[in-house]
Amino acid sequence: MNFIPPQDETRLRAAASGVLPNGKPVVVNADGTVSVAASTNNSQIVGADEVFESATIAFTCSTFDSNSNKVVIAYEDKGNSNYGTAVVGTVASNDITFGTPVVFESATVGNMGPKAITFDSNSNKVVINYADEGNSDRGTSIVGTVSGTSISFGTAVVFNSSATYEIGSTFDSTNNKVVICYGNGGDGAQGYAIVGTVSGTGISFGSAAEYEGGESKYNSAAFDTVNGKVVIAYMDDADSDKGKAVVATVSGTSISFGSIAVFNDAITNYVGIDYDSSSGKMLIAFKDKGDSDKGKAVVGTISSTSISFGSEAEFEAGQTDHLSVAAFSAASQVAVFYRDSDDSNKGKVNMGTISGTSVSFAGAVDITAGTISLSTAVNDTNANQLVFAYKDDANSNYGTANVFQPAYISTNLTSENYIGMSGGAVSYTGSAASTGSAVVYNSGASKFQGAAFDSNSN
């Protein structure tokens, strides 16, 4: 082995684990050795239908608890006096299993959108937001703590003293706040948002602020981790049912808004949104009633307190209903789960890939054979699989869920473990070959950005 000249700062020496072919990306391993970056071909998987509630359900929403690595689904249990209920799901072996459902509100609950539940990663708590019909439909929140396959709750707190509609929520990880968006029945169902702070098993709120002066429906929210902004997407019932979005900024316990932007000029239903960390963009999906009820999506780009949109893309040519959106970071894609009402009301998913201000879709995949409604989608970032929950109309309206994994190539190459390109294959024999020999490689650029490595091309 030749010594590296001290003045050559672009070449390094390290102990190799395995052979390093010439000109390949090199990563540092946990034991300090280095190896060529590896990739894995992941096949498409559609898991079996798994029942989480053997009764009719409504108002389904879901989130992923990254502290316990569990999926939490909240819903109205019509088999138990319409009580608000939640259940913990564990994803493993391409399937999902559930613990025992737990009541969080002993009264009829309602008006929970697909994202009416969120996970606070600062306090490691789940927050469920709902209309409490046992208390004049007031907007109410409750904090849940996951332990094993169960969940326990603190005391419910009212965030809106009037009737509350079409609830969405997200977690602002920059400010460690929960943001809830909703239609305020005390003010003509206009769009309002409020900031919540979780402490222990409770939550407190600042003052609500209006983001839409007309009646706001299908309220949904997502958080942009790069810009530190919340985006609320909705239908403006007072402006020809157009699809609109607004950027929100959290400061302390207050929230303010930029200018409202239109993403669809026609009648818009079933609005869903999520943030794609791979592209740094928002994806909004919706039903376009101005174009034969097709499923459409649009990419949103945040600049300061404004959002702009690229061209619409179609993910479903048939009538699209009951949709939900979930980013799938493992494949740098975004999933749109929905009901295809022109194809036996099946539950389907279409995976979108964002490039610039555009999104392209891979093609619809059947998740269910029968009718579904009230769907919600969530990404289990521990198992790297999506979970779709819904009311299974084909099976007595039971609460049901499926695991889904799209076909994609994964790699162990990241911006944190990449250290350069190999400068040449090294021959070594004897015990050195198994323990790792010192090899020379070129460190090259100090940063790795957004590339994929195919080990089959070695």
Regions of interest found by a model, annotated:
Residues N41-S410, T429-N458:
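Extracellular, repeat-based ectodomains that mediate carbohydrate processing or recognition
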Residues M1-A48, I409-N458:
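Glycine-anchored, exposed beta-strand/edge motif detector
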